[in-house]
């Protein structure tokens, strides 16, 4: 074991040395590469294709994140709208991967683009997601091949429940929750879905389904509810799509005007080549992204914790004429304690804080958001989930099956709390629930103060209930429906700023931090990931809802 440890240490040291030696070379090569930038001279057509988009990324000395950031996307589209030389935008549906929120956030800009530019969408397979992107265009075409089709379905939700399989191993995972709809972790403790969870998920799924139906009605003047539910639009060919008025015809890439040898560039090439306008304003609004689960660990690339939030907030001290801060939150929640520590740190800031919610701003994410003077959500943001949950596993039956005899001694009570080899007594369980109620009370106090709502009215919309942004606006959990740009503009307007510039605060990692985070990547089964989640969050009081991450 010692030899293996020494060998591993030697390998890591070697990697660090190699990286340090090669970094200057990478830097030089990067400088040469930058000289080959695409020229926009004579360019009239931009192909909008985007396979990867991130809300936030880490700046390190040895790596560059090649994915386009959310704000870079918005900036580039705004510039494109003002670029009189660009006459046509072609949306390549097969090369687009955007979330619901990202689609919503670019709608307004595409409406501006369509005023003086031709926008055409083309693709082979249109599902509900990609078709919503296609609806940004003035004209929708299928690629002229018999392989092109529509693939519209209703909705379904499935997830595995592990109680019985864990029982065969002698493992029991207990979940305690404050709030009937705070159902995180029930897939470990139950053998089937609770009615509360089913009700909550059906509410979200049905609303999203109706949103899609209504959007198609608005844009294409056709109701396709019956066709979808009957399965008629599963692998529906171009003839069916034209008949229903869902597309305008068939075409090839060349016929719609894609010619990379003449006047066409991809969107990312346009982003790298267009000339940025210099902003000489003295007024600054800072943007900080908080993305990922809220936890103390750094095992995942996207984690929100007190330390990395403090690092970002410390950078605000170096910004001259800082007028306000926009927090962009994209999180399903996590540690209750970490959420409170972040909340307290933000509370000390003497500038107005506005909140822009991404795909997710639920549980601990919403907890942090309550610090905001004004909260913006997208209509399809998942938010709320005001409640508390705790998971604690027991292995008493496991050691019995293995014929292991636990021997020891104690003086006093409470040693069964969070001892995985002891059954939890009712007395200890009551103490845990008392502590959870205290934490829940603190959560509600923040919401009551931030939203100016009575505790009685709050309970009607809390208890772990999850809401779409449009619903959260109706029940008072957010102030406005809008994009990141809308949030920024609102802050500037309320501050009465005639002009302003934006400064984006990024996390930073050293060479050693990047190398230490390097681990072999293996394909993980859903079960393994779930077990790792139990291990990570066991015995911690949580503001968390794991069901929302891949919803």
Residue ranges with predicted function:
Residues 328, 401, 504-506:
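C-terminal recognition in membrane/secretory proteostasis and scaffolding
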Residues 2-44, 82-87, 112-119, 124, ...:
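Flexible, low-complexity junctional segments that flank or bridge functional domains
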Residues 485-517:
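C-terminal intrinsically disordered, low-complexity extensions immediately downstream
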């Amino acid at each position: 074991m010692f030899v293996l440890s020494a060998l591993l240490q030697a390998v890591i040291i070697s990697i660090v040395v190699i990286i340090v030696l090669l970094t200057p070379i990478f830097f030089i090569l990067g400088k040469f590469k930058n000289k080959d930038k695409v020229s926009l001279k004579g360019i009239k057509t931009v192909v909008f294709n985007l396979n990867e988009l991130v809300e936030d990324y880490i700046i390190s000395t040895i790596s560059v994140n090649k994915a386009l950031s959310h704000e870079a996307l918005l900036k580039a589209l705004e510039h494109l709208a003002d670029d009189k030389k660009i006459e046509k935008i072609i949306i390549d549906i097969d090369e687009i991967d955007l979330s619901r929120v990202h689609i919503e956030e670019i709608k307004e800009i595409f409406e501006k683009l369509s005023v003086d530019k031709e926008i055409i969408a083309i693709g082979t397979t249109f599902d509900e997601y990609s078709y919503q992107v296609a609806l940004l265009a003035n004209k929708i075409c299928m690629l002229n091949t018999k392989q092109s089709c529509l693939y519209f379905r209703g909705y379904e939700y499935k997830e595995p429940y592990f109680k019985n399989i864990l029982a065969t191993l002698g493992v029991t995972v207990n979940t305690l929750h404050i709030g009937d709809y705070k159902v995180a972790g029930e897939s470990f403790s139950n053998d089937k879905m609770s009615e509360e969870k089913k009700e909550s998920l059906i509410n979200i799924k049905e609303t999203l389904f109706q949103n899609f139906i209504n959007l198609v009605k608005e844009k294409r003047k056709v109701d396709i509810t019956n066709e979808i539910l009957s399965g008629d639009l599963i692998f529906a060919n171009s003839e069916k799509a034209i008949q229903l008025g869902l597309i305008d015809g068939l075409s090839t890439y060349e016929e719609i005007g894609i010619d990379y040898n003449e006047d066409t560039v991809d969107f990312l090439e346009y982003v790298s080549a267009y000339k940025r306008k210099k902003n000489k304003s003295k007024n600054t609004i800072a943007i900080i992204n908080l993305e990922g689960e809220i936890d103390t660990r750094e095992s995942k690339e996207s984690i929100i914790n007190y330390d990395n939030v403090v690092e970002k907030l410390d950078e605000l001290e170096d910004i001259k004429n800082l007028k306000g801060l926009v927090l962009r939150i994209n999180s399903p929640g996590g540690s209750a304690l970490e959420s409170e520590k972040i909340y307290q740190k933000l509370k000390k800031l003497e500038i107005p804080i506005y909140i822009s919610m991404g795909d997710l701003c639920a549980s601990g994410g919403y907890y942090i958001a309550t610090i905001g003077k004004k909260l913006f959500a997208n209509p399809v943001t998942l938010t709320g989930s005001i409640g508390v949950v705790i998971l604690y596993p027991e292995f008493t039956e496991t050691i019995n099956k293995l014929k292991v005899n636990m021997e020891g001694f104690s003086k006093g009570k409470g040693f069964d709390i969070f001892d995985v080899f002891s059954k939890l007594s009712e007395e200890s369980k009551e103490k845990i629930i008392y502590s959870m109620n205290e934490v829940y009370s603190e959560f509600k106090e923040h919401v009551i103060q931030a939203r100016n709502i009575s505790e009685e009215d709050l309970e009607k919309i809390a208890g772990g209930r999850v809401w779409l942004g449009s619903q959260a606006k109706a029940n008072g959990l957010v102030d406005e429906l809008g994009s990141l740009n809308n949030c920024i503009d609102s802050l500037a307007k309320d501050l009465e700023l005639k002009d302003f510039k934006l400064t984006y605060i990024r996390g930073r990692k050293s060479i050693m931090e990047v190398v230490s985070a390097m681990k072999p990547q293996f394909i993980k089964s859903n079960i393994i990931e779930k077990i790792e989640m139990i291990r990570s969050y066991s015995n911690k009081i949580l503001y968390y809802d794991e069901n929302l991450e891949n919803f």
